[in-house]
UniProtKB/Swiss-Prot annotation:
Cystine bridges: none
Disruption phenotype annotation: Viable, but 85% of animals are sterile at 20 degrees Celsius. Reduced number of intestinal cells in 1.5-fold stage embryos due to defective intestinal divisions and binuleations at the 16E cell stage of embryonic development. Knockout with wee-1.3 RNAi suppresses the defect in intestinal cell divisions in the cdc-25.2 single mutant. RNAi-mediated knockdown causes abnormal male tail morphology; this phenotype is suppressed by simultaneous RNAi-mediated knockdown of wee-1.3.
Keywords: Cell cycle, Cell division, Hydrolase, Mitosis, Protein phosphatase
Name of the protein in its database record: M-phase inducer phosphatase cdc-25.2
PANTHER family to which the protein is assigned, alphabetical: M-PHASE INDUCER PHOSPHATASE, M-PHASE INDUCER PHOSPHATASE DUAL SPECIFICITY PHOSPHATASE CDC25
Enzyme Commission no: 3.1.3.48
Length: 480
């Protein structure tokens, strides 16, 4: 009876010792510093702990059967019964996740952005779940308007949607401003919209029908250019009275050029400020129904500028009736009077120029008179030109010599005498007076004889003078 119990105790004791050893080893492994998991642990490292997991260990225990002494059994191998003993212990499993961001960063607490898969049967439910927010109506001011509700998908639902679903558009959008665009039909039969757009374009632009033959190259939208042959044909086709009733020919050159030779029936006017007096009265009404033709020496500066000045006055008077103009059709003689004169001279036509001569603007005989005008300059000032013309008109007769003398005084050296100032009193009144410059000598030395520039006036008188060098060659007594 005692032997089986001892055997059972001997068997159970090593099993219990084995179990305790296994428990101690497992605890040492989990708390050991050599463990790879615990090496990554740190105080500031964010850790995601999973739920506690349980592990079961099965141990087989052999238990002996108790046999009574009274039972007559044959000796043989002892039959043993196996018993399963289950030990349960809790083991904490830790998972360490390292992040690049700082532990205090706001991204640590953000919702995970991993791609999520959605079942096809749940996609319909996601589409039904929608939230509403406010959106402004489309208008020019899209910041302060009454809100309107627009359905939009949730942010989480957008992530879970597959590629087969429709693309979500933002609720807020800038207003679309419709831009007017001119479209023209490329077919042989344009549409009605094309004609309406062309009529709308004609209302904002002045369309002029020129009846004379013009130069092919269009130089300006305000006027057109005609050749010398075209103007010559007009004189041959119309009489002098018919020409005056239909056209007005304006010579924009200076008076000395006009007097030496100009086209017949032409009037001289070079001031662009007073061009309105020719075509309009004091009340701003149109004087005549004539077609203006402008020209100058080359028709490059003075003639075209006069045409632009007339168009500017016309626009100012008809500002409420834009784009209507009183003088819509205007012409400029191409290449000017110079080309017209030589073309008529080659054709032996002498009755088109009165007198039949030509004077250049830079003629040497009229150099001083050219200084009165500067309308041919690109940077000319109208106010300065008007003031200069008035000052020259106020000069008395016989003051041409005084003007020449005063102009020569600007180029010559300043004079110290006051005789020229007294003789030019009349000229000084008509122009800006020039301050006379009188040269004065600087007395840098108390004694003028000490000045290095006055050696000729005050020769030096010294008792001891430096001996002059010998003019004969030097001789050495050794070689003499």
């Amino acid at each position: 009876m005692n032997r089986p119990s001892q055997i059972s105790q001997d068997v159970a004791q090593p099993l219990s010792n084995q179990h305790e050893t296994a428990m101690m080893s497992s605890d040492e492994d989990s708390m050991s510093r050599d463990s790879g998991i615990c090496e990554l642990m740190d105080e500031n490292t964010p850790v995601c702990f999973s739920s506690m997991s349980t592990e079961s260990t099965t141990v087989q225990v052999e238990e002996c059967m108790e046999i009574d002494e009274d039972e007559n059994l044959q000796p043989g191998p002892v039959s043993r019964r196996q018993k399963k003993v289950t030990f349960r212990r809790e083991k904490s499993s830790c998972q360490v996740r390292l992040f690049d961001e700082s532990p205090t960063s706001h991204k640590m607490f953000m919702r995970p952005q991993a791609p999520l898969s959605v079942r096809s049967e749940n996609q319909q439910l996601l589409q039904q779940r929608k939230r509403k927010f406010e959106k402004s109506e489309q208008s020019s001011d899209h910041f302060h308007l009454e809100p309107m509700s627009v359905e939009a998908m949730d942010d989480d639902e957008i992530v879970m949607m597959d590629q087969n679903t429709t693309k979500w558009e933002p609720g807020f959008r800038a207003p679309n401003h419709k831009k007017g665009r001119l479209t023209r039909s490329a077919t042989a039969f344009p549409s009605l919209e094309t004609f309406e757009e062309e009529e709308h374009e004609e209302q904002h632009h002045l369309n002029v029908k020129y009846h004379l033959k013009t130069v092919a190259k269009e130089s300006s939208k305000g006027f057109r250019r005609i050749t010398a042959e075209t103007l010559r044909d007009i004189f041959f086709r119309l009489s002098e009275k018919e020409f005056d009733d239909k056209y007005i020919l304006i010579d924009c050159r200076y008076p000395y050029e006009y007097n030496r030779g100009h086209i017949k029936n032409a009037i001289n006017h070079f001031d662009r400020v007073t061009v309105s007096k020719i075509f309009y009265d004091e009340n701003g009404r149109k004087r005549c129904n004539k077609i203006p033709i402008f020209y100058c020496e080359f028709s490059q500066a003075r003639g075209p500028k006069m045409a632009y000045a007339l168009r500017q006055v016309d626009r100012e008077l008809n500002v409420n009736h834009y784009p209507k103009c009183d003088y819509e059709e205007m012409y400029v003689l191409d290449l000017g009077y110079r080309n017209f004169f030589f073309a008529a001279n080659e054709a032996n036509i002498t009755n088109l120029c009165q007198p039949h001569a030509y004077c250049e603007m830079h003629d040497k005989e009229h150099t001083m008179e050219l200084k009165k005008y500067n309308f041919h300059n690109k940077g000319q000032s109208v106010l300065r030109t008007v003031s200069m013309s008035r000052s020259f008109k106020s000069l008395p007769t016989g003051s041409a010599f005084n003007f020449v003398a005063s102009s020569a005084s600007f180029t010559s050296a300043p004079s110290t005498s006051t005789e020229n100032i007294d003789t030019n009193d009349d000229c000084q009144k008509s122009r800006t007076p020039a301050v006379p410059r009188i040269a004065s000598r600087r007395n840098l030395f108390s004694d003028p004889s000490h000045s290095p520039t006055n050696f000729a006036q005050f020769p030096l008188t010294c008792s001891r003078e430096t001996p002059s060098p010998h003019k004969h060659p030097l001789t050495c007594p050794r070689f003499s």
